[in-house]
């Protein structure tokens, strides 16, 4: 019977597995949310491109982006809410197993850094160009399709 007991995962191993699963969920959430935000921005870009060439300007581009601000905010808020749920579950698992919460702190820090970098990147795309070259559209399409190269 000692062989059966030794093959069963220990509480520590189970905790490690749960934490790894939470990290995986966070990564999936971020990938899904990024794709959603890029898609919303791409729809704003399509709206901008639907204007005749002579009407395409940075003002028109920004206006198209602003028309999507509600969608962008809702997507961001949904992502933040899901992230908060995952973090609460991860911290609870760590506490219940007498573990240090530094891995959760690090996950939260990384999430915030990635979120801020994405917001900065999207803002940069929204407030640049407007010259009708299509550079922003190509960039957004690549990211919305998930062909992101780090």
Question: What is each model feature region?
Answer:
Residues 2-150:
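Soluble, non-transmembrane alpha-helical interaction regions
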């Amino acid at each position: 019977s000692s062989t059966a007991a030794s093959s069963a995962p220990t509480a520590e191993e189970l905790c490690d597995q749960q934490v790894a699963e939470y990290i995986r969920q966070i990564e999936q959430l971020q990938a899904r949310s990024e794709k959603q935000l890029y898609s919303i921005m791409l729809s704003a870009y399509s709206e901008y491109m639907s204007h005749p060439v002579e009407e395409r300007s940075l003002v028109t581009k920004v206006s198209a982006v602003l028309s999507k601000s509600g969608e962008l905010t809702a997507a961001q808020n949904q992502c933040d809410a899901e992230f908060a749920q995952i973090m609460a579950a991860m911290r609870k698992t760590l506490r219940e197993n007498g573990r240090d919460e530094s891995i959760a702190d690090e996950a939260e820090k990384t999430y915030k850094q990635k979120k801020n970098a994405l917001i900065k990147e999207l803002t940069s795309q929204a407030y640049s160009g407007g010259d009708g070259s299509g550079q922003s559209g190509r960039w957004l399409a690549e990211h919305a399709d998930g062909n992101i190269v780090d």
